[in-house]
């Protein structure tokens, strides 16, 4: 399986997506 990616707006792709990036895989703007 591939790591999950969390779609986020550039304004919201800060702490929530940083945590998701460490825990689940990645965050894409």
UniProtKB/Swiss-Prot annotation:
GO molecular function, one term: potassium channel regulator activity
Keywords: Disulfide bond, Ion channel impairing toxin, Potassium channel impairing toxin, Secreted, Toxin, Voltage-gated potassium channel impairing toxin
Keyword Disulfide bond (UniProt): yes
Subcellular location(s) of the protein: Secreted
Domain of life: Eukaryota
InterPro entries from the UniProt entry: Scorpion_toxin-like_sf
Family: Belongs to the short scorpion toxin superfamily. Potassium channel inhibitor family. Alpha-KTx 03 subfamily.
Further remarks about this protein from its record: Negative results: has no effect on rat Kv1.2/KCNA2, Kv1.4/KCNA4 and Kv1.5/KCNA5 channels.
Protein name per its UniProtKB record: Potassium channel toxin alpha-KTx 3.15
